[in-house]
């Protein structure tokens, strides 16, 4: 009866852990569509990969089939996440992630396994140490998403804090706590107590900052002011580009009306636009000749 209950709880734990593993899928689909990692961080996924690797090693030592199956899937999926992240991360973030993976997921994991296999001869002692190390990094998995709390508080937005990851981590922590309790495996039960607390803290943070309209009133006001300034600039540009716009002046308008009503004279054309400013050759007729002089008359 107890074994059946343990197996049932373990199955539920595997299902919830699988949902935890799949929770970042929308995040990486967004990364793929936008071809950019934006402000997402790789630390939670690198830590999750290391935790899955350590629990996989622990499951091999204890011959725990349920832990073995779910952590094998976890290693595969977390590796795919990091691969997608590296493909679309900017140069600086990509370099940091590569260093992190090489130092933590390769060098550190290899050092732990080599030390336990070569230096610890007793199997029970090896299992105890492997369980303690796995429990420590399980806590790191729960804490890792909290690295973006500062960003959430500063921006007053939970856009880059996956809600479903925190939600399923909380449920998974509850189930795995009872699994470890029933199995009397305190390396499994203990970290999930703090995991539950960290998960609840993340969900509370999500509730507080989930309303972007309420929490970004200042940002929206600033954006509205920028739009207003932009509209004014566009209006000013349109006025400057208009060919016949003048300041509003009553006297000037009246003078313009009088000038428009005045008849056209040679000295002043009716419309300045009608003036042809090109050179004009005018033929001036010669002046009239004076009448011929009368012959002189002699007087007798």
UniProtKB/Swiss-Prot annotation:
Q: Which GO terms describe its cellular component?
A: membrane; plasma membrane
Subunit structure and binding partners: Forms homooligomers and/or heterooligomers.
Q: Which residues are exposed on the Extracellular face of the membrane?
A: 1-4, 62-67, 121-128, 184-185
What induces its synthesis? By the X.oryzae pv. oryzae (Xoo) transcription activator-like effector (TALe) proteins (artificial TAL effectors).
Bias class Basic and acidic residues marks the residues at 269-280
Q: What is this protein called?
A: Bidirectional sugar transporter SWEET12
PANTHER family assigned to the protein according to its UniProt record, in alphabetical order? BIDIRECTIONAL SUGAR TRANSPORTER SWEET15 (PTHR10791:SF222), RAG1-ACTIVATING PROTEIN 1 (PTHR10791)
The segments labelled Disordered in the record are 256-300
**Primary location recorded for the protein, binned into one broad class:** membrane
Q: What is the stated purpose of this protein? A: Mediates both low-affinity uptake and efflux of sugar across the plasma membrane. Confers blight susceptibility. Confers TAL effector-mediated susceptibility to Xanthomonas oryzae pv. oryzae.
Native organism taxonomy: Eukaryota, Viridiplantae, Streptophyta, Embryophyta, Tracheophyta
Regions that span the bilayer: 5-25, 39-61, 68-88, 100-120, 129-149, 163-183, 186-206
Superkingdom = Eukaryota
Q: Which residues lie on this side of the membrane: Cytoplasmic?
A: 26-38, 89-99, 150-162, 207-300
Q: What GO terms describe the biological role, i.e. biological process, of this protein?
A: carbohydrate transport
Location relative to the cell: Cell membrane
UniProt keyword annotations, A-Z: Cell membrane, Membrane, Repeat, Sugar transport, Transmembrane, Transmembrane helix, Transport
Q: Where is the composition biased (Pro residues)?
A: 284-294
User: Record's family?
Assistant: Belongs to the SWEET sugar transporter family.
**How does this chain sit within the bilayer?**
Multi-pass membrane protein
* GO molecular function per UniProt: sugar transmembrane transporter activity
Matching entries from InterPro entries are given as: SWEET, SWEET_rpt
Describe the location of the MtN3/slv domain by residue ranges.
Answer: 8-92, 131-213
Keyword check for Transport: yes
């Amino acid at each position: 009866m107890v074994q059946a209950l343990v197996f049932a709880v373990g199955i539920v734990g595997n299902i919830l852990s699988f949902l935890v593993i799949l929770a970042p899928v929308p995040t990486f689909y967004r990364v793929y569509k936008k071809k950019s990692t934006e402000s997402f961080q790789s630390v939670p996924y690198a830590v999750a990969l290391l935790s899955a690797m350590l629990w996989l090693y622990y499951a091999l030592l204890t011959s725990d089939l349920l832990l073995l199956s779910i952590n094998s899937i976890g290693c595969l999926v977390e590796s795919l996440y990091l691969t997608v992240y590296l493909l679309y991360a900017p140069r600086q973030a990509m370099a940091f992630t590569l260093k992190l993976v090489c130092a933590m997921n390769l060098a550190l994991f290899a050092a732990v396994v080599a030390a336990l296999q070569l230096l610890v001869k007793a199997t029970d002692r090896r299992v105890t140490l492997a369980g303690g190390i796995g429990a420590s990094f399980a806590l790191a998995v729960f804490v890792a998403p909290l690295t973006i709390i500062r960003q959430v508080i500063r921006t007053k937005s939970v856009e880059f804090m996956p809600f479903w990851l925190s939600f399923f981590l909380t449920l998974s922590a509850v189930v795995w706590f009872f699994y470890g309790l029933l199995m009397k495996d305190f390396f499994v039960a203990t970290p999930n107590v703090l995991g539950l607390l960290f998960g609840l803290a993340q969900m509370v943070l999500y509730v507080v900052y989930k309303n972007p309209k309420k929490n970004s009133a200042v940002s929206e006001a600033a954006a509205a002011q920028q739009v207003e300034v932009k509209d004014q600039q566009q209006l000013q540009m349109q006025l400057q580009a208009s060919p016949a716009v003048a300041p509003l002046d009553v006297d000037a308008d009246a003078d313009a009306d009088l000038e428009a009503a005045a008849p056209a004279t040679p000295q002043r054309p009716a419309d300045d636009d009608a003036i042809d400013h090109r050179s004009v050759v005018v033929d001036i007729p010669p002046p009239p000749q004076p009448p011929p002089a009368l012959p002189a008359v002699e007087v007798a």
